[in-house]
């Protein structure tokens, strides 16, 4: 066992002495040491109860013959961090979480790992760190929250609350109506109830085989979720000494491919592209945006969940058959699903999905009745995004899939919010928000506030938005993000001027600005990218080391 390095031999008497101080005895030194990376934090609805899941996991590990050691990571709630300087810390927190997992696991030479994440950057951060450690690992998330409901029974979620702000600003709803939405949108603990970033990443963990079936869709704070935690903890002990289940043996090119298949079939958050680029690099099987676009062209979009379809939430998809049913339906197009990929249960993906059935063909549609013959995410290229940009096609109205608009430029999210609220954005505009990329922000803020304002103010079918920042998984509409190169590194998005004509053509996978190469070259002659001092030593370091979105916004280490 790896942990023998800290517990075997006379030389390790001091180490054992310290371990005895934590309650270990002679018999424990013969057992596998299992790390539990928890992300309990009181302020996040999907995490405030994870301390109890950690306790359950420890109990099960002991019963199964292991010795548990629980430790914690930090966490950021993107919804609470939204719309102010706190959002600059969200994406950087992914790197801190990955580093902390690597640090604790390798410093103490633990044999296996149970990861208990749930929201936003915590899932990919844990997965990146666990891949570096490369011990047998099982993921079990905290689970999605229930959908909220208004007094008339209408299902709502957090995105409803964000869009309600725009409606209130326009006088379309009253303070009382806004208050009802505020009080009902998030009715329980759990990750926000739609196919937002947290649930998207938890679904992808299931698709990659690093989590048990149900990980992405079983509701939080239910007996079924608790049982999932128990099974995951026991499984970590069972595989602790089995080389087949070292994490990089599971998260290989086939598993990453399957994750992107499910992502496209379910129209996941655009943030999944950013995270899977980063995860694939840690796995030693790097994806590119071209790879992702190739997969998108072969996978039908068969499930729509909020925000793409406001009435459908994760609990509905679970009742309809969950991720196994989605994979099984996608696999009907031969060769799309890599069915030989091994999962943490010891089954292959093919074996896992063989008995899956779709209980509601309107929620998980057959291929013959797909929403689209291609995936719910798309990668765009063009002179405005030479290295690529990402759009959630699942959330775009058909009338906006091809759109040309007049650029109105903002050099920060704050400027854009003020401009939208102040009535500067009109039908026919193509909003440009720049200097919000990984380096320029720094931190690549999510643009849920401006996109929700656009939708809430009734501009969703007449205004598009493009940014080198990113979006919440709750964003919908003609919103293109992750533009690379970003403005801060000299990207063309920094050269766009008010009045330029910008075109998005989803079918052609194109994002262009109608400005000649000669004119762009002329503008570049006097162009100096803006530099923003974040007033934080951590964010300064982050800005210095981070790559652009086309590379997953990972930190460079080669120049250190």
Curated annotation (Swiss-Prot):
Biological process, per Gene Ontology: isoleucine biosynthetic process; L-valine biosynthetic process
Named cofactor requirement(s): [2Fe-2S] cluster; Mg(2+)
Catalytic reactions on record: (2R)-2,3-dihydroxy-3-methylbutanoate = 3-methyl-2-oxobutanoate + H2O; (2R,3R)-2,3-dihydroxy-3-methylpentanoate = (S)-3-methyl-2-oxopentanoate + H2O
Details of cofactor binding: Binds 1 [2Fe-2S] cluster per subunit. This cluster acts as a Lewis acid cofactor.
Keyword Translocase on entry: no
Keywords in alphabetical order: 2Fe-2S, Amino-acid biosynthesis, Branched-chain amino acid biosynthesis, Iron, Iron-sulfur, Lyase, Magnesium, Metal-binding
InterPro entries tied to this protein: Dihydro-acid_dehy_C, DihydroxyA_deHydtase, DiOHA_6PGluconate_deHydtase_CS, ILV_EDD_C, ILV_EDD_N, IlvD/EDD_N
Superkingdom of the source species: Bacteria
The EC number(s) this enzyme carries: 4.2.1.9
Binding-site positions, Mg(2+): 78, 120-121, 446
GO MF annotations, alphabetized: 2 iron, 2 sulfur cluster binding; dihydroxy-acid dehydratase activity; magnesium ion binding
Class of the enzyme per the UniProt entry, highest EC level: lyase
Gene3D superfamilies: IlvD/EDD C-terminal domain-like
Keyword Amino-acid biosynthesis belongs to the record: yes
Modified residues (N6-carboxylysine): 121
Assigned GO CC terms: cytosol
Function: Functions in the biosynthesis of branched-chain amino acids. Catalyzes the dehydration of (2R,3R)-2,3-dihydroxy-3-methylpentanoate (2,3-dihydroxy-3-methylvalerate) into 2-oxo-3-methylpentanoate (2-oxo-3-methylvalerate) and of (2R)-2,3-dihydroxy-3-methylbutanoate (2,3-dihydroxyisovalerate) into 2-oxo-3-methylbutanoate (2-oxoisovalerate), the penultimate precursor to L-isoleucine and L-valine, respectively.
NCBIfam families (UniProt xref): ilvD, PRK00911.1
Subunit annotation: Homodimer.
Descriptive protein name: Dihydroxy-acid dehydratase
The encoding gene: ilvD
